[in-house]
């Protein structure tokens, strides 16, 4: 793969994976604007690994607490913060697994990957994020997250399987509609991404593991490192800005990009 394409794909995926702007919406524009071919599943796996490493490193304290609490959560002992976090992440992932299985076996996952669908989801869910952010109460923090809210946010996250929705954007929408403050809502949404990124990475990885050669492994390593670095930078910037800035700038960007995609689809 050309080095320039490798860099562009890794940076786009890394920056947009955790911002509420949809990585798929950007990646579908790349070949149309540059004439480059699709990067392939192997590079998709690599950038997933890179973004997974980024979120684990950025929220390592929460990840450690969740891993330590996981055995207690599995036997129903929710007497620690880590156990409650682990249970919440498990519960929140279930709707996505069920819906993803449905899309896979019905073949709908491929039919949804059109420019028109991505344009509409970018636009519509951008507006939904704005409404939730501006009208939602701010009376909850991460310590209030329990099974009920995990189920609700998991149902929101399920919609992210429709390309253009933005996994981080839709889960943040769910968090704000439930009353979580912006910073903690984003933090919960980022932690919820870990099981889903692992699941999608494993699914893609099983399809490319036997076909990788030395050159491809090198490209995958470069892509993973670039995606991790750019994702870490994007996470740090967003979490810092959320202390004083709403999600409105992301909404404006989403709506504008959605309109561009709709123009491409119907123009």
Swiss-Prot record:
Query: Which reaction equation describes what this protein catalyses?
Result: di-trans,octa-cis-undecaprenyl diphosphate + H2O = di-trans,octa-cis-undecaprenyl phosphate + phosphate + H(+)
Compartments where found: Cell inner membrane
According to Swiss-Prot or TrEMBL, what is its membrane topology?
Answer: Multi-pass membrane protein
GO MF terms listed in the record are:
undecaprenyl-diphosphatase activity
Question: Which GO biological process entries does UniProt record here?
Answer: cell wall organization; peptidoglycan biosynthetic process; regulation of cell shape; response to antibiotic
Keyword annotations: Antibiotic resistance, Cell inner membrane, Cell membrane, Cell shape, Cell wall biogenesis/degradation, Hydrolase, Membrane, Peptidoglycan synthesis, Transmembrane, Transmembrane helix
EC number(s) of the enzyme?
3.6.1.27
* Highest taxon of source: Bacteria
- TM spans (from-to): 1-21, 40-60, 85-105, 112-132, 188-208, 219-239, 245-265
Q: Does the keyword Transmembrane helix apply?
A: yes
A GO cellular component term found in this entry reads: plasma membrane
Record bears the keyword Disulfide bond: no
The record's InterPro entries line, in alphabetical order, gives:
UppP
Function statement: Catalyzes the dephosphorylation of undecaprenyl diphosphate (UPP). Confers resistance to bacitracin.
Anything else the record notes? Bacitracin is thought to be involved in the inhibition of peptidoglycan synthesis by sequestering undecaprenyl diphosphate, thereby reducing the pool of lipid carrier available.
Record-stated family: Belongs to the UppP family.
Query: What name does UniProt use for this protein?
Result: Undecaprenyl-diphosphatase
